[in-house]
């Protein structure tokens, strides 16, 4: 045989585990019984009793398969005993659990409908020595130390009892195998025998000097009917090579053996109690615990090795480790397992049909895997390698065949799932929601106020193995208001060892201490540097994060001075509380504390905001609003706004992605916004929290400020912007050569709040170099929104620079001016389109609504851009520049119209975008693009696109669908033209085949120009019809390449946002817009391909899509050169990845906004030709482009522009939707002749989570509707001569701008457009540029836009096929976020309703300024709208999600899992508490807490989402509460909500 302790972290409770009992899973129905029982032994439940009087019931499994689903709840902590639990005994036949405590209390527990309750209670007041169930489970034998014995039925009826008068105590009692007799062992070595009716039969002395510790039979504990003896007849049988998983054949014993353990360590094996010649085992162990396996062939004897000299025992080093010896039925020693355990083994039990031996030693629980047969060489090798590797993740480093790697990895699959998946990564565990339906059951305890700390401390514990594992600690920081900070559990390195052997003794020692000491222990563990260590920051010292005069349009002077640390909080001297000076909270203090989050509140304690303070968390973590009835006669109402938080892969970026949020006080009283300038010293207010640009017409930062701010933000991101340092940005004007870097002076002040503060360069200025696109600024935004390019000089054209992220791919691209024209200074091609890419990703910040003063239309001069895009050089296409991804994330601080400060972290690479367009290039592109510079960076795509990859988090998409975003590939494509190149060869090859078809079709379409486009649009199948396809399957098409606009003049065709969508029958699948601007370099196309290639993995997924996505992309002739029809710029393409289709419904309108894809007029045409122009008809580009765009603009019909007609036709598939929507949205404005190209660029709202360049996972969750509400800036037309951009149209209404986005989305993008809008909104919540966008518009403007767009476009879309299409796109949409969808459905109601909901949102918004977007909580009116529009925003989401939406949601979930939780931040969930029922009898309100809550309290509450409970909180003791929660709550968010509630003064 073979036995080995399981690899992995040590499992431990918070107190000594005193007893164990295991039972197998029971068939749920009669139908399951015929199946092999082995299945039931593979899963089971372990009961533990501990020193705190808590019984733990924990799920265990031995199948070593990660794909098996587990129960929603895998641990129960059963409270009720008043002293330590000394015995636990399962009754398997009746599924009951008996537990006994040291005071003699006996509870019999039974589980019903998921909850455990006490069925029987027996308390005689005397200590229980043993409790045993009969083998058939019908009777219980209870023996007391004082000699009293009792036999009763399983239902609690007493059969008989007897008093045995002895001089010694009874130590154990057991049933004989036939249940006809009972045997009792005594402390003086005697055995007493009685029959089942209580008559005394015998009294035998077994040992004169040694007392009997325990007795047992090598016979199954329970006789459970076994329907099958075969090990292989179960459908999920796994071969014996699983080692310990293989089960032995039962031993057929002629006669059971009675095993008696003595205090000396000897064990006697007897045929019966009167056996005169027993087999004696001299174990050589002391404190022996012995138990036969279920099969009866193996006896495990555990104990401490006896020392030669007892005097040495006291010395720790001289203590020997505990050992487990295995013997057979003949008493022969078979195997010895040496453990590293240095404490006595208190209890052992077999489980999982003898393949596991569970041992308890102190608070630790060890699992031993046992192989009964001769161990195979494979098993020995597995154990040897596993013990060397120590971690599962190291298995993949070995050069072993997949089958062996899989086998080796089974050694690391735990039998008992640890409470924290990775003990060394507690931070992730508490910061992000658990996957799937896993529910966390926690206990929250309060410790006494500590004057040093300044307020009461609360610790959140995860219930596990009957104990509590501390995971978070929070403390109150204000005596005036209920405000708290939550500590980072990783502040102390020791926390990593919490489960390590080194700390076990500490944990144990503390276990038996009082609760307060326990909490202290956890405090130490959770935040070693916490309150006490940082005495400098005492109590209410923690300033609230707020800006002094929140209502003031200008930043407080102090804030300006400290613009470098926008996130640091400043206490507002108001309410009579003394203002804190910076000295009180030195910067070091904050870092010392390592706070995760802060809970702020208004003075009344009715509104709370949860602000993320850690760099890896979104700034906005949620809000809680309490509403009470008159006279407090009714239960209070809670509304929770909860943004979905997703993890960003640190592999790609170690920079935090933030949702733009306002870090401010409650809206009510102190509208304080965390200004960009909060004193650095201010504590936890997070130093590194980027503030989303809040652009309000009233406020703007000076270039210097903005630069400083950007610098500080970038510094945090490790992003270097050449421009940052200088007022003037050296913009690598993607000049014709693309080498030249032009410096643009930074305007002293951004004229428009919408301006993005990047590098302090004004977008308008930047645009100077390239012909400026006259983009009609959205009404709200100032005409000119300077876009700053984070990266000044793109001299590093090379991809490496791109990779650097430090630089924007192109300064201009960096510009994320709110709606500014794409002012790619160098690249004449308008990057606007590119910029348009929806800012779905948190990293992206749409420029403020301000549009750069419409720069002069980009003249044809743009063509030179082409030059600039040299193949190798090509560092930044306008496109690439557009995505200057290499930079990483830029954090921007802005103020919204209400004066709230918002920080947005957007991918470093930003494209200038028309005012109406959002700069967020591709979600991932911005950061990603860095790579683009050089193909040489091929591998870079992922790397450089730190964001990039994040942005593209790949969602699992139905196979039929194109990858929502070619994850990295598409992002990279967008973000990194060069990177694209990298992949391009692959993609090229992959796409080329399709591209050719598409190219031909495209060419034909292009030739037809618009006309073909229309047909194209219609034909979903043709590559050329990609455009048409877009409409057909717009979602994929939705991916608009923000980069499109960036295409160089020669790449103007490159601008082709040919939304790959339009190509290929997969149109629906191919949502990628291959907009890569055709660089002068053919590589561009290659890049596009490569971007896709990067997606290759996806590509299989999307291969169809790819061709579709990229068919017309041949970007101009140049692209054409890369015949792969998809010449879209991978960069662009990547961005495009986000399929708007998903958000097709309401999203479309916003996408239109995004749509502002601006290209030089020439570019515009080029773009048109872009994907659609077949290599052969580069000249067609314009026509093609229109065609492409036409296909891209389903709304053309709605657009006033006649030129769109062609497009319109193509849109027809989605036309109904988009057109109607657009029409409502004033599509006319949106659609501009130039727009189609823009459209084609389709901003690819980051709606598609994966697509978002921000790549902050947040995006995916984003609700689609938010995009809509965002109504990005009106699409900025490149006002290229080619298309009379009808800037006026765009300008006409911000609303209009959304339509353009829609246009972009049109190809199926419409949904996307809408999604984009929604996305943005969501993003805001999620740290996306959403707020930026809204802010760009100016809140009012945005509101108008949102409401109109939402009503019109959304409604239209919703009403039209949009809903249907959206559903079609739903895969993407769901990825993005269903909220949008929900909203769309709502929208279907009527514009008025929408408006109402909008108003509601605004009123209900958490933030003070009713005008401003919902305070970042919802990242946008839309969000609020959706959620608040009907306090059941989630309902709309839910309704939308029904059917296909539901599937999409599942898809998203699956993909999230695949991505390892990489993705975009999700949308904001709006939830309300469940109203309690009135109990007439007791005259109280009641809620059913499933037995978890034991005390009535007005603070008890339950939160529901879509009809299911996702959180419950209730009092169980004076200072203890239970807190149960599941997705979408993360531990930090749930804890914050609980803290807000604990101090709630309202009834």
Swiss-Prot record:
Composition bias, Low complexity = 533-546
Swiss-Prot/TrEMBL keywords: Cytoplasm, Methylation, Phosphoprotein, Repeat, Ubl conjugation pathway, WD repeat
Q: In which pathway does it act?
A: Protein modification; protein ubiquitination
PROSITE patterns membership:
SOCS (PS50225), WD_REPEATS_2 (PS50082), WD_REPEATS_REGION (PS50294)
Main localization of the protein?
cytoplasm
Q: Region Disordered: which residues?
A: 530-580, 1374-1414
Q: Region annotation TUB: residue ranges?
A: 1436-1547
Spans of the WD repeats are 80-119, 123-162, 165-204
One short Pfam name that applies is: SOCS_box
Domain of life here? Answer: Eukaryota
GO biological process assignments = protein ubiquitination
Would I find Cytoplasm among this entry's keywords? Answer: yes
Alphabetical list of PANTHER family matching this protein: TUBBY-RELATED (PTHR16517), TUBBY-RELATED PROTEIN 4 (PTHR16517:SF2)
Family in the record: Belongs to the TUB family.
Q: What is known of its domains?
A: The SOCS box domain mediates the interaction with the Elongin BC complex, an adapter module in different E3 ubiquitin ligase complexes.
Q: What is this protein called?
A: Tubby-related protein 4
**Gene designation per UniProt:** Tulp4
């Amino acid at each position: 045989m073979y036995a080995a302790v399981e690899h992995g972290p040590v499992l431990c409770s918070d107190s000594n585990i005193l007893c164990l009992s295991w039972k197998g899973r029971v068939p749920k129905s009669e139908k399951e019984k015929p199946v092999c029982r082995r299945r039931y032994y593979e899963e089971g439940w372990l009961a533990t009793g501990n020193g705190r009087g808590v019984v733990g019931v924990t799920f265990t499994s031995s199948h070593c398969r990660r794909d098996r689903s587990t129960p929603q709840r895998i641990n129960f902590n059963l409270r009720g005993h008043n002293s330590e639990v000394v015995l636990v005994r399962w009754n398997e036949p009746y599924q009951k659990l008996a537990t006994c405590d040291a005071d003699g209390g006996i509870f019999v527990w039974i589980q019903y409908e998921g909850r455990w309750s006490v069925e029987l209670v027996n308390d005689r007041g005397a200590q229980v020595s043993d409790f045993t169930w009969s083998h058939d489970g019908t009777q219980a034998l209870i023996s007391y130390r004082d000699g009293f014995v009792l036999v009763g039925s399983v239902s609690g009826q007493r059969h008989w009892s007897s008093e045995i008068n002895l001089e010694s105590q009874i130590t154990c009692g057991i049933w004989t195998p036939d249940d006809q007799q009972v045997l009792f062992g005594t402390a003086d070595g005697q055995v007493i025998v009685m029959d089942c009716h209580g008559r005394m039969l015998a009294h035998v002395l077994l040992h004169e000097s040694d007392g009997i510790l325990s007795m047992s039979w090598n016979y199954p504990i329970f006789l459970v009917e076994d329907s099958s003896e075969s090990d292989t007849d179960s459908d999920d049988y796994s071969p014996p090579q699983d080692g310990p998983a293989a089960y032995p054949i039962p031993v057929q014993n002629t006669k059971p053996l009675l095993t008696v353990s003595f205090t000396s360590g000897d064990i006697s094996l007897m045929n019966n109690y009167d056996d005169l010649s027993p087999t004696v085992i001299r174990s050589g162990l002391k404190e022996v615990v012995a138990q036969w396996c279920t099969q009866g062939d193996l006896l495990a004897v555990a104990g401490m090795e006896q020392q030669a000299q007892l005097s040495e025992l006291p010395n720790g080093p001289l203590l020997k480790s505990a050992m487990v010896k295995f013997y057979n039925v003949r008493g022969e020693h078979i195997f010895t397992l040496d453990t590293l355990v240095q404490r006595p083994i208190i209890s052992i039990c077999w489980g999982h049909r003898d393949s596991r031996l569970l041992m308890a030693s102190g608070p630790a629980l060890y699992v031993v895997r046992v192989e009964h047969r001769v161990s195979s060489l494979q098993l020995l090798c597995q154990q040897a390698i596993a013990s060397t590797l120590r971690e599962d993740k190291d298995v993949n480093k070995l050069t072993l065949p997949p089958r062996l790697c899989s086998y080796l990895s089974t050694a690391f699959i735990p039998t008992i799932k640890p409470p924290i998946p990775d003990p060394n990564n507690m931070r992730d565990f508490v910061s992000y929601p658990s996957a799937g339906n896993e529910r966390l059951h926690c206990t929250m305890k309060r410790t006494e106020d500590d004057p040093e700390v300044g307020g009461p401390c609360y610790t959140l514990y995860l219930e596990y193995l009957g104990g509590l594992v501390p995971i978070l600690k929070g403390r109150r920081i204000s005596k005036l208001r209920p405000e708290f900070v939550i500590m980072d559990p990783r502040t102390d390195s020791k926390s990593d060892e919490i489960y390590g052997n080194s700390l076990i003794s500490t944990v144990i020692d503390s276990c038996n201490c009082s609760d307060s000491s326990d909490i202290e222990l956890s405090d130490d563990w959770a935040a070693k540097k916490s309150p006490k260590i940082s005495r400098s920051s005492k109590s209410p010292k923690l300033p609230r994060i707020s800006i002094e005069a929140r209502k003031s349009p200008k930043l407080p002077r102090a804030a300006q001075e400290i613009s470098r640390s926008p996130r640091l909080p400043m206490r507002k001297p108001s309410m009579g509380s003394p203002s804190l000076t910076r000295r009180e909270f030195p910067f070091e203090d904050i870092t010392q504390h390592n706070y995760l989050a802060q809970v702020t509140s208004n003075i009344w304690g009715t509104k709370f905001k949860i602000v993320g303070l850690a760099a890896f968390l979104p700034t906005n973590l949620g809000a809680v609003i309490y509403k009470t009835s008159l006279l407090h006669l009714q239960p209070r109402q809670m509304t929770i706004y909860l943004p979905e938080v997703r993890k960003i892969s640190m592999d790609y970026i170690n920079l935090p992605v933030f949702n733009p949020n306002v870090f401010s006080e409650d809206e009510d009283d102190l509208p304080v916004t965390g200004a960009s300038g909060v004193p650095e010293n201010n504590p936890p207010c997070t130093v590194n929290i980027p503030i989303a640009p809040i652009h309000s017409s009233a406020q703007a930062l000076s270039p210097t400020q903005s630069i400083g701010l950007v610098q500080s933000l970038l510094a945090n991101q490790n992003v270097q912007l050449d421009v940052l340092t200088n007022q003037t940005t050296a913009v690598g004007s993607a000049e014709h050569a693309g080498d030249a870097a032009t410096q643009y002076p930074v305007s002293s002040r951004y004229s428009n709040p919408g301006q993005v503060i990047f590098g302090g360069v004004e977008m308008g200025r930047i645009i100077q170099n390239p012909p400026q696109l006259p983009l009609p600024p959205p009404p709200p935004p100032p005409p000119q929104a300077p876009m700053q390019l984070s990266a000044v000089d793109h001299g590093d054209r090379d991809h490496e620079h791109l990779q650097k992220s430090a630089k924007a791919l192109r300064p201009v691209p960096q510009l994320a001016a709110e709606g500014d024209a794409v002012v790619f200074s160098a690249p004449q091609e308008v990057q606007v389109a590119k910029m348009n890419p929806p800012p779905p990703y948190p990293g992206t910040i749409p420029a403020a609504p301000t549009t750069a003063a419409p720069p002069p239309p980009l003249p044809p001069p743009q063509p030179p851009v082409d030059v600039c895009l040299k193949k190798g050089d090509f560092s930044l296409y306008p496109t690439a520049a557009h995505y200057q991804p290499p930079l990483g994330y830029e954090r921007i601080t802005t103020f919204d119209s209400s004066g709230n400060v918002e920080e947005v972290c957007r991918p470093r690479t930003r494209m200038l975008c028309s005012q109406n367009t959002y700069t967020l290039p591709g979600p991932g592109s911005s950061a990603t693009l860095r790579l683009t510079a050089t193909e040489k960076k091929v591998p870079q795509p992922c790397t450089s696109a730190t964001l990039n990859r994040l942005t593209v988090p790949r969602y699992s998409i139905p196979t039929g669908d194109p990858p929502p975003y070619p994850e990295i590939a598409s992002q990279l494509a967008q973000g990194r033209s060069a990177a694209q190149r990298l992949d391009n060869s692959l993609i090229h090859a992959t796409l080329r085949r399709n591209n050719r078809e598409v190219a031909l079709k495209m060419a034909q379409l292009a030739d037809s120009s618009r006309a073909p486009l229309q047909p194209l649009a219609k034909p979903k199948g043709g590559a050329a019809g990609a455009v048409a396809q877009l409409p057909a399957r717009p979602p994929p098409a939705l991916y608009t390449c923000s980069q499109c606009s960036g295409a160089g003049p020669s790449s103007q065709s490159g601008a082709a946002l040919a939304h790959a969508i339009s190509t290929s029958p997969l149109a629906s699948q191919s949502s990628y817009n291959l907009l890569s601007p055709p660089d002068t370099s053919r590589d561009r196309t290659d890049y596009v391909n490569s971007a896709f290639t990067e997606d290759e993995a996806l590509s299989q997924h999307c291969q169809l899509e790819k061709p579709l996505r990229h068919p017309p992309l041949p970007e101009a002739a140049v692209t054409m050169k890369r015949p792969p029809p998809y010449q879209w710029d991978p960069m662009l393409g990547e961005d495009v990845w986000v399929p708007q289709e998903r958000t097709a419904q309401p999203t479309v309108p916003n996408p239109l906004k995004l749509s502002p894809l601006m290209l030089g007029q020439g570019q515009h045409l080029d773009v048109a030709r872009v994907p659609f122009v077949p290599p052969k008809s580069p000249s067609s580009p314009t026509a093609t482009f229109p065609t492409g765009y036409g296909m891209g603009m389903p709304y053309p019909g709605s657009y006033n522009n006649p030129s769109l007609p062609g497009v319109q036709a193509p849109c027809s598939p989605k036309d109904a939707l988009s057109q109607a929507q657009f029409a409502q949205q004033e599509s006319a404005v949106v659609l501009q002749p130039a727009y189609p190209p823009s459209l084609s660029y389709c901003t690819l709202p980051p709606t598609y989570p994966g697509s978002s360049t921000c790549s902050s996972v947040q995006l995916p969750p984003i609700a689609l509707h938010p995009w809509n509400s965002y109504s990005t800036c009106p699409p900025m037309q490149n006002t290229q001569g080619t298309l009379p951009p009808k800037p006026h149209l765009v300008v006409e209404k911000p609303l209009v701008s959304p339509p353009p986005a829609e246009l972009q989305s049109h190809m199926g993008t419409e949904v996307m457009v809408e999604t984009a809008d929604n996305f943005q909104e969501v993003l805001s919540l999620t740290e996306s540029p959403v707020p930026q966008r809204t802010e760009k518009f100016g809140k009012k403007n945005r509101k108008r836009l949102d409401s109109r767009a939402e009503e019109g476009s959304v409604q239209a879309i919703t009403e039209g096929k949009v809903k249907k299409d959206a559903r079609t796109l739903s895969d993407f949409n769901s990825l993005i976020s269903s909220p949008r969808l929900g909203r769309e459905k709502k929208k279907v109601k009527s514009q008025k309703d929408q408006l109402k909901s909008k108003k509601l949102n605004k009123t209900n918004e958490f933030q003070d300024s009713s005008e401003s977007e919902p305070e970042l909580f919802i990242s946008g009116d839309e969000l609020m709208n959706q959620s608040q529009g009907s306090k059941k925003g989630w309902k709309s989401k839910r309704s939308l999600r029904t059917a296909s939406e539901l599937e999409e949601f599942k898809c998203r979930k699956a993909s999230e899992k695949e991505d390892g939780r990489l993705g975009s931040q999700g949308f904001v969930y709006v939830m309300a508490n469940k109203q309690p029922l009135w109990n007439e009898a007791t005259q109280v309100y009641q809620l059913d807490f499933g037995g978890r809550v034991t005390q009535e309290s007005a603070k008890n509450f339950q939160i529901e989402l879509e009809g299911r409970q996702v959180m419950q909180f209730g009092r169980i003791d004076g200072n203890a509460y239970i807190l149960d929660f599941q997705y979408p709550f993360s531990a930090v968010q749930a804890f914050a909500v609980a803290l807000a509630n604990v101090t709630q003064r309202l009834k």
